[in-house]
């Protein structure tokens, strides 16, 4: 059956174990639309807000990518990994162990060097609060992770790192508007697997560690793995990320977002427009004739829906083009006559200071993205066809 191509946004709650591209592929297949993209990659181990645009709304993605974001994460202190997260190999650092014992003696009564000690969480709370406030809030310089998608002379940093090559990334400015410690758990790990849970007993060879739950609101381009790495480095004990959940991208937030950074009048109805998903497996034969099994992203829709019914259910849960544009950038209500002028590439007599969505409110028509031409006029930089 032929369909008119719709445009809008889906807020996907990405599950763990799949890539952001897997989620895009799931939306593309369910909606039968080729033009689909996302506003900011989430690593496979991460969950949460993935803003996926389809149709003409993909032209809003550049604006959405630049929005600030909120994450909830768990940082493990006491060890390091090769990738600064739970996907890498554990690195047991003798200097870090020694530093842990020094902190143990400072923060506990009778802490003895040479013995694995789980520090009281109350003592850690004060130390972490002071360290974060001094070093990891406001405008800071951050060196991205070696295992990142940043390109160096045309090659991804993670590809170079996997090949064993030296990767040098320059620090870049980022802004941390919130870095709150939510909970602290003290315990021990064997140090063999990065994702192993903390345990209370200290067996022979056990390594003391601390899991710190945090909420971080930050500018676009901030690496939470790098914050975990740098917090551990600042304390001298090592650190890496074991859990990451993105709860907000600009005004697009999951129902469980607790940042409080979206003004009530600016809130979108995310409960209606969030689609959860889960990880499943698919098996296929590759070009070499090998049988391959890998994870895939499956969108959660009511049981029994398929084909057009499933497609329509997802479209009903999507943000419309107008809602998407108003959420992506400042919006300006215009007249139908002004919309026509913009579609012909002409300027309109409006004063604006930043890229703005020009919308005819009566018909919900998103005509264009406009920018300042001069003190009294605005000009179109992106024009959308009349729906």
UniProtKB/Swiss-Prot annotation:
Top EC class, one word: isomerase
Catalytic activity: uridine(55) in tRNA = pseudouridine(55) in tRNA
Keywords: Isomerase, tRNA processing
InterPro entries: PsdUridine_synth_cat_dom_sf, PsdUridine_synth_N, PUA_sf, tRNA_psdUridine_synth_fam2_C, tRNA_psdUridine_synth_TruB, TruB_C
UniProt cross-references to SUPFAM superfamilies, sorted A to Z: Pseudouridine synthase
Family: Belongs to the pseudouridine synthase TruB family. Type 1 subfamily.
Protein name: tRNA pseudouridine synthase B
GO molecular function: RNA binding; tRNA pseudouridine(55) synthase activity
A Pfam family matched in the record: TruB_N
């Amino acid at each position: 059956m032929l369909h008119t191509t719709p445009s809008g946004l889906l807020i996907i709650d990405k599950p763990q174990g799949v890539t952001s591209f897997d989620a895009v592929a799931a939306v593309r297949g369910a909606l039968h639309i080729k033009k689909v993209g996302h506003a900011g990659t989430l690593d496979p181990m991460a969950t949460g807000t993935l803003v996926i645009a389809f149709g003409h709304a993909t032209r809003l993605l550049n604006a959405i990518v630049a929005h600030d974001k909120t994450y909830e994460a768990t940082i493990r202190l006491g060890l390091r990994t090769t990738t600064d997260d739970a996907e890498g190999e554990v690195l047991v650092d003798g200097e870090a162990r020694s530093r842990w014992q020094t902190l143990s003696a400072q923060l506990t009564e009778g802490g003895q060097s040479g013995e694995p000690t789980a520090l009281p969480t109350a003592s850690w709370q004060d130390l972490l609060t002071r360290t974060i406030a001094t070093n990891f809030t406001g405008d800071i310089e951050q060196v991205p992770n070696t295992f990142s998608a940043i390109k160096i002379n045309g090659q991804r940093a993670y590809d170079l790192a996997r090949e064993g090559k030296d990767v040098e990334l320059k620090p870049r400015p980022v802004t941390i508007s919130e870095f709150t410690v939510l909970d602290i758990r003290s315990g021990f790990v064997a140090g063999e697997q990065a994702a192993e849970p903390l345990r209370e007993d200290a067996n022979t060879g056990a390594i003391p560690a601390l899991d710190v739950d945090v909420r971080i609101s930050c500018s676009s381009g901030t690496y939470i793995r790098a914050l975990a790495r740098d917090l551990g480095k600042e304390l001298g004990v090592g650190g890496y990320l074991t859990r990451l959940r993105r709860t907000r991208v600009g005004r697009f937030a999951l129902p469980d977002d607790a940042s409080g950074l979206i003004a009530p009048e600016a809130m979108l109805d995310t409960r209606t427009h969030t689609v959860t998903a889960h990880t499943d497996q698919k098996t296929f034969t590759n070009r070499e004739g090998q049988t391959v099994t890998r994870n895939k992203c499956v969108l959660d829709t009511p049981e029994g829906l398929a084909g057009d019914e499933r497609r329509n259910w997802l479209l009903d849960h999507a943000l419309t083009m107008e809602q998407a544009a108003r959420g992506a950038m400042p919006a300006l209500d215009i007249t139908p006559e002004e919309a026509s002028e913009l579609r012909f590439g002409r300027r309109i007599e409006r004063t604006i200071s930043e890229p703005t969505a020009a919308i005819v409110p009566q018909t919900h028509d998103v005509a264009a993205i406009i920018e300042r031409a001069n003190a009294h006029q605005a000009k179109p930089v992106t024009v959308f066809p009349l729906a």
